[in-house]
Amino acid sequence: YSFEPSEINFELLKLNIKSKANIKAFKYGASSKDQKIVLYTLSNSDSGHSSVLYSENSNINFDNKETIDLVNLDNFLNKNNISNVKFIKIDVESYELEVLKGTQELIKKDKPIIAFEQLINGLKNHTSDSINFLKKNNFNYFYETDFAKRKKYRFKIFYIFSTLIHIFKVIFIRNYNQTHKIKKINNFEIKDYPIIIASPEDLQK
């Protein structure tokens, strides 16, 4: 299951999964509650560079916007009889905490592995709101992988798919490409983390 609220990204997503009958796409974003919200984008940049957290003090001059639909994932999954979720990938440009707040029932019941982006501006005292939220919900193991260093793609969505496939293989196929391994994070450095993998269990046992 894939969620993408942006019009252009959703069209790219449909092209990517056209031959994959086992992938279902929904034109929604995820949040702590169901709502409509404005998504700000850059028309002359890759289509993944967008945010719902617009600030006039930002060093990014967004020049385009669209109204998108956000859903609480717990409610959405219950309404659509979706269960047994074992892996979640989140890339929402500093909106991670709101997404996580909408998955509290899911993470308590299914205990999925969660991969998310953590930007440096959200890290304070070697932690963040998202990391603290996960720790309070018994996610005590955090990892990074060298594959998460961003490659150059015309559209960010292609990078996301490439990284997602790799992370899935590293976690669930233990003998996959041993040149790329996950590394446990014992102390969060003050830096950008393209991918953090959070788990309620030790993935290196």
Question: Predicted regions span which residues?
Answer:
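Phosphate/nucleotide-binding beta-alpha loop and adjacent structural elements of enzyme active sites
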Residues: 1-205
